[in-house]
Amino acid sequence: MKTLALFLVLVCVLGLVQSWEWPWNRKPTKFPIPSPNPRDKWCRLNLGPAWGGRC
């Protein structure tokens, strides 16, 4: 019974390690950090002036 509990704990820890990435291993995000200005966001999405896309 004790070995089963130990095995379950090991599986949980391994799952956590798999899902958690090292900070230096993290892939760079595709998009830059969005600015707080929503108009600038629409501008970058190229939706045009009708959607507040004036640059």
Curated annotation (Swiss-Prot):
Region (Sufficient to induce PMR): 36-55
Tissue specificity note: Main cells of the accessory glands of males (paragonial gland).
Domain of life: Eukaryota
Signal peptide start and end residues: 1-19
Molecular function via GO: G protein-coupled receptor binding; hormone activity
GO biological process, one term: sexual reproduction
Keywords of this entry: Behavior, Cleavage on pair of basic residues, Disulfide bond, Hydroxylation, Secreted, Signal
Post-translational modification Isoleucine derivative, affected residues: 33
Residue runs in coiled coils: none
Disulfide feature: 43-55
Phenotype of gene-disrupted mutants: Viable and fertile. Males are able to transfer sperm but can only induce weak PMR behaviors in females.
Marked site (Cleavage) residue numbers: 26-27
Post-translational note: Sperm-bound protein is cleaved to release an active C-terminal peptide. Gradual release from stored sperm may function to prolong PMR and enhance male reproductive success.
Family stated for the protein in its record: Belongs to the Drosophila sex peptide family.
Name assigned to this protein: Accessory gland-specific peptide 70A
Record organism: Drosophila melanogaster
